[in-house]
Amino acid sequence: MFMAKTGNGTLTLEKRANHPGSGRRKAAAYQKGRQLQPFETAAVKKLIGEGPYERPLLIEYLHLIQDAEKCLPAGHLHALAELLRIPMAEVYEVATFYAHFDVVQDGEEKPEPITIRVCDSLSCMMAGAEKLIASLGAEDMPQVRVLRAPCIGACDVAPAAEVGHKHVPKATVAKIKKVVEKGDFHATIPKYQNLAAYKKEGGYTVLGECLAGTRTVESIISTLSDGGLRGLGGAGFPTGRKWTFVRAEKGPRFMAVNGDEGEPGTFKDRHYLERRPHQFLEGMLIAAWAVEAQEVFIYMRDEYPAVLEILDIELKALEKAGLLKHTKVSVRRGAGAYICGEESAMIESIEGKRGLPRHRPPYVAQVGIFNRPTLVNNVETLYWIPQILEKGAEWFAGMGKNGAKGNRSYSVSGRVKKPGVVLTAAGTTVKELIEACGGMQDGHTFKGYLPGGPSGGILPASLSDLPLDFGSLEKYGCFVGSHAVVILSDKDDMKDVALNLMEFFEDESCGQCTPCRTGTEKAVKLMQSGDWNQDTLADLAQVMRDASICGLGQAASNPVVSVF
């Protein structure tokens, strides 16, 4: 403000004009940016319901819009930002991070309403996925789009495809066209053991004893530790020790179940959840009781629509039966991001954010969901808990061999006659797994194998007598990880195999750190050009291992180094 003299000599108080760059701007006479229309807000409310709206549920809201609209219209995203009272940029960065969301700007055409996803990961490619993709592209199918997709967890029925939410095992053009013509794109729910059947065989007895005080937390942790139960999602960390670490942290505490088994070649969790979901759920509820978790978040991949529906049905049954009184259970649906299998990235996604791995320390056992101590366990790890506690540590530990403890669920796919989940002793060899799967396919000779999915590297047939368990393969530059075993034959070019795996990692890199983002891209370009300079690729691999934030970048080069 300043004083100005008028013509009659009086003084008036006037407002000084802001000069450019002063940092003080006049308020805009109109709102900047895209204007939200009332009908857009009404449309979003109709899909996600009336409030109160929660910021951590952003991804769930995006799913509801995507499912209904077959895309994410810009106006709906704007309305969602207003309802959540967060910046539009925050909604946009999440929506564009996940592969299963299709953001459509104003004026852009919506994608075709029917989406066919064909898996192009290793097992499916060996089973003819490339030819299937090309054939589908040549078909005249109105209102249909065909997309390549990373592993959908159906490697035992390769080549696999998904039409909407319906899986098509051993997919052919004819099978897929039949689904499209029929118009039923909902998941096919397999026959599974429900709550009544599980309780009839004694299910939830152990949980009941825990809640009644008959069993102590200390005795349960001791039994799991003596039995040798380890994390079966890939890391192999001792379960009892992890529970002890979380219990030592001050509450409130949370628990997260990692059901995002996106490692190509892995399908064991789906196998159990589609057959005996309550054995897993009882193990989960025992774990929640042991660490006094006030809420459990089951993070399940979007590629498992049948599992998501089963969990919805059976959690409601548990609620009705009064078995969820000691904790709250919520299901969070992934959206096509492999990186969310990394525990801290999964926690970011549970909080409704981009799935970017966190820097550690602190570890999630100390600072996890909503910055509280969090127990993270894999589906199969929890699956074995009721039986171990019922039958004893000696029962479980005694099933291993070659120095290993317990049993293992090996997901076996590739060039075997009968792919599937092989439940057998920990420490089993690949030679024994091939025999359990009916031997090699006719006309194929065993050449090599992936012992633990793409991250685990590639081993030659000459090392077929190695026991497959945690710690047994590291001296060969490999590891067993999630026990995803892919069998290769003399018909497979190892360089083509390694390129397929590296292309997967390039596509799934979250892009947060340069060694992984640029390293995978550079490796793919070198491999595609035919320039397999061993020194260059080895140097690149070393940088990725040493400097990447998480396991994706650290392990991405394993298949490449394996074929030198």
Regions found by a protein language model. Name each.
Residues 98, 276-290:
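Histidine-anchored nucleotide/phosphate-binding helix
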Residues 308-426:
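Hydrophobic alpha-helical positions that pack around
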Residues 210-249, 411, 423, 442, ...:
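Accessory "access/gating" subregions that flank catalytic or transport cores
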Residues 199-205, 257-269, 364-369, 411-416:
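Gly-rich Lys/Arg/Thr-decorated short loops/hinges at beta-loop-alpha junctions or inter-strand turns
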Residues 26-116, 120-186, 205-226, 250-255, ...:
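Ferredoxin-type iron-sulfur electron-transfer modules in oxidoreductases and energy-metabolism complexes
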Residues 283-285, 426-441:
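Short amphipathic, charge-patterned alpha-helical segments
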Residues 114-117, 144-145, 160, 252-255, ...:
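Structural motif
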Residues 179-226, 371, 377-392:
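Flexible inter-domain linker/hinge segments
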